[in-house]
C-alpha cells in the first residue's frame, strides 16, 4: 500500500468512527435496552435473545412545587383537599390527588429490533413486564387510591403518601397500570418477530395526605426528595416451533431502576378566610328614592337604590403560602328579618308594617347583572345552604385586588299579598352570612 492510499484509507476510518460516536451519544436512544441474539445447540437449535445491562430512570414532577391547603373556613368536606401549583395560572386550584405528570431527560424502554425468526410458522413471543416496588423506601399503609392502586408512605414522611402508575407506550397506544405493593406484572408484551417495534415507559404519580390537618401544629414544608420507588424488568419467556426443531428464549439480564424526584410540598394548615371591614355594606343603611303610588301601579316594579357588599381577603396568614395567594371562594346568603320565608326560593323581602308604613309593597334585590334575583335562605355558612351564591367578583392576586364584592339593586315591587297599595314609609331589614369555601 503506498502512502497516498494509506492516508485515504485512514481518513475514511476516521469519518466512520466519528459517525458511530455521534449515533451512540444520541439521547433519544441512550436508555433504550436493545437485544443481542445468540444461537446454540445442534441439531436442535436454541435462539436466545437477551437484554443486557442495568439502566437508571430518573423522573421529575412537571411542577416544581405544590401548596396543599386545608379547607376554607366553612368547607365541611374534609376529603377534597385542594392544591395550587407554583407558576400555575392565577387562582389555579385542583384536587391534591390528581395525577401529576412527570418528565425524563431521555426516552426509556425496550427495542425489539433484532428479534428474528426463520421458522415457519414463528411462535408468538410473550414477555411479561414486571414491577418490583422498593419497600425499603415505600411503606404500604394498606390504603388504595380512587383508581384501585396502592398508596405508599414515603420513607421518613408520615404525613404524605404516594401512588404510581407505569405507562407502557407501544406504536399504537399508551396503557397506564397501577403499581402494587408486591412483585407484579404490569403487562404482557406481545413481541412480533422480524420487526423494529419498541416500547417506551412513562410514570405519573398521585400524592395523598395520610393525616388530618387538625393534627398538624403548624404549616409543614416537605423538601424535594430523590426516592427509589422500584425496578422494572422482563420475565424470561420460552417457546418453540410447531415441530420443536427450534427453541426460542427471550430474557432480561438486568433491570431498570426508577428514581422519582418529588416536588416541594407545603401543607398549609391555616384555614383560608376573609374579613369584613368597618363598612362591608355601602351605603348602610341603604336609602331608597321616593316613588309615587301611581308609578308603581303602572309598572309593578321600580328601581329604588343600590348598595355594594365587599369583604377583604388580603390576610397573608390565612391566604398566602410560599409567595402565592390561595383564596377561598367567597359566597353569601341573605336572610330576611321581618317574616319572609327563608327557604332559598322566595325573592321578596317583606317590609315592616305599622303606623305610617306603606302597604301592598315588598322589595326585591337583584344582582349585578340586573336579571338574577337574591333568594333568601337560613342564616348559615354551611356549604350548599339554600339561597347561597358566589359573589360576582372574587379576589385576585393582581395589585391590591385581594377582595370580593358585588353591587346590588333594590326594587319596589307591588305585592297584593301585603294588602292594598297605600303610600307610606318603606322599611325592611336583611342580614347576610359569608361563607368561605
Swiss-Prot record:
It comes from the Bacteria. Gene3D superfamilies: Fimbrial-type adhesion domain. Keywords: Fimbrium, Signal. Coiled coil: none annotated. InterPro entries: Adhesion_dom_fimbrial, Adhesion_dom_fimbrial_sf, Adhesion_dom_sf, Bact_Fimbrial_Adh_Pro. May be a minor structural protein required for pilus biogenesis. May be the adhesive component in the pili. This is Minor fimbrial subunit HifE.
Amino acid at each position: 500500500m503506498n502512502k497516498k492510499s494509506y492516508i485515504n484509507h485512514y481518513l475514511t476510518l476516521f469519518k466512520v468512527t466519528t459517525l458511530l460516536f455521534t449515533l451512540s451519544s444520541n439521547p433519544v436512544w441512550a436508555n433504550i435496552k436493545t437485544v443481542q441474539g445468540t444461537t446454540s445447540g445442534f441439531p436442535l437449535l436454541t435462539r436466545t435473545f437477551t437484554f443486557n445491562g442495568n439502566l437508571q430512570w430518573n423522573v421529575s414532577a412537571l411542577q416544581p412545587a405544590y401548596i396543599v391547603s386545608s379547607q376554607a373556613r366553612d368547607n365541611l368536606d374534609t376529603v377534597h383537599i385542594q392544591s395550587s401549583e407554583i407558576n400555575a395560572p392565577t387562582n389555579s386550584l385542583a384536587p391534591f390527588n390528581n395525577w401529576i405528570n412527570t418528565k425524563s431527560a431521555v426516552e426509556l424502554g425496550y427495542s425489539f429490533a433484532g428479534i428474528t425468526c426463520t421458522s415457519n410458522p414463528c411462535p408468538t413471543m410473550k414477555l411479561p413486564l414486571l414491577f418490583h416496588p422498593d419497600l425499603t423506601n415505600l411503606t404500604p399503609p394498606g390504603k388504595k387510591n380512587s383508581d384501585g392502586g396502592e398508596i405508599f408512605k414515603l420513607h421518613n414522611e408520615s404525613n404524605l403518601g404516594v401512588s404510581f402508575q407505569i405507562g407502557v407506550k407501544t406504536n399504537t397506544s399508551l396503557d397506564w397500570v397501577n403499581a402494587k405493593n408486591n412483585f407484579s406484572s404490569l403487562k404482557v408484551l406481545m413481541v412480533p418477530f422480524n420487526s423494529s417495534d419498541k416500547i417506551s415507559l412513562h410514570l405519573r404519580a398521585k400524592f395523598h395526605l395520610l393525616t388530618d390537618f387538625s393534627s398538624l401544629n403548624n404549616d409543614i414544608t416537605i423538601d424535594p426528595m430523590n426516592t427509589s420507588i422500584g425496578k422494572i424488568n422482563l420475565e424470561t419467556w420460552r417457546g418453540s416451533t410447531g415441530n420443536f426443531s427450534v427453541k426460542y428464549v427471550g430474557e432480561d439480564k438486568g433491570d431498570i431502576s426508577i428514581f422519582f424526584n418529588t416536588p416541594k410540598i407545603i401543607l398549609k394548615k391555616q384555614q383560608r378566610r376573609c374579613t369584613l371591614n368597618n363598612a362591608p355594606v355601602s351605603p348602610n343603611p341603604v336609602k331608597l328614592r321616593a316613588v309615587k303610588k301611581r308609578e308603581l301601579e303602572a309598572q309593578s316594579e321600580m328601581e329604588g337604590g343600590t348598595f355594594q357588599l365587599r369583604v377583604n381577603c388580603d390576610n397573608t396568614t390565612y391566604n398566602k403560602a410560599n409567595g402565592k395567594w390561595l383564596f377561598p371562594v367567597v359566597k353569601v346568603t341573605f336572610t330576611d328579618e321581618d317574616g319572609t320565608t327563608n327557604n332559598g326560593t322566595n325573592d321578596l323581602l317583606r317590609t315592616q308594617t305599622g303606623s305610617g308604613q306603606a302597604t301592598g309593597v315588598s322589595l326585591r334585590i337583584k344582582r349585578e347583572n340586573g336579571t338574577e334575583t337574591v333568594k333568601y335562605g337560613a342564616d348559615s355558612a354551611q356549604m350548599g345552604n339554600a339561597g347561597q351564591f358566589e359573589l360576582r367578583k372574587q379576589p385576585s392576586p393582581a395589585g391590591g385586588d385581594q377582595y370580593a364584592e358585588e353591587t346590588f339593586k333594590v326594587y319596589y315591587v307591588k305585592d297584593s299579598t301585603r294588602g292594598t297599595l297605600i303610600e307610606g314609609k318603606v322599611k325592611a331589614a336583611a342580614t347576610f352570612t359569608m361563607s368561605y369555601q
